[in-house]
Amino acid sequence: MATPERRTAPGTPAVHTGAPVASGPVPVMAPLGWLLILAAGTTLILGSWLLYGTTAEGMWAGYHDGIIGTVVVLAGMGLNTSLPKQPLLGICGLAGILLILFAVFFDYPTHVVVIEMVSGVGLLLGVGLYASGRRD
């Protein structure tokens, strides 16, 4: 009969992997804020194309909301690059404040006021979430 052999030498030390690395929470706030910024800008652009009328109020609201929406979408896409984040967040925040002021003080039809108010509040919430979720 054959005698069983030991596979490892008795002097071989056991391999220790060390203490497990503590992982932090999954970053949710910044991506959610970024998504909200882009959604608000896209809503503003699509609303100005599809919902605003061809009257004087609808045309002027379409002009400034289309420009603001385009700037917001470009700034939102810039947040995922190596560009500095603070100026882009400032642009988005100012656009949100401006949209809320447009909705409150201009005498536009109800659907224009709703689109501007929803986009403005969405922008401010997105900027707040993005800024609170960033650690750099």
Please place each PLM-identified region on the residue numbering.
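Intrinsic N-terminal pre-sequences and regulatory tails
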Residues: M1-G33
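Membrane-helix interface "capping/anchor" motifs
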Residues: G78-G90, S132-D136
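Membrane-water interface at the C-terminal end of transmembrane alpha helices
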Residues: A30, L123-D136
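Membrane-helix boundary connector in multi-pass membrane proteins
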Residues: L83, L99-M117, R135
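Membrane-embedded alpha-helical segments in integral membrane proteins
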Residues: A39-T54, I100-F102
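Hydrophobic alpha-helical membrane segments
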Residues: L88-A103
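Short juxtamembrane and helix-loop transition motifs at transmembrane-helix boundaries
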Residues: P20-A30, G47-G58, L74-P84
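Structural signature of hydrophobic alpha-helical transmembrane segments
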Residues: E57-G69, L89-G90, I115-G120
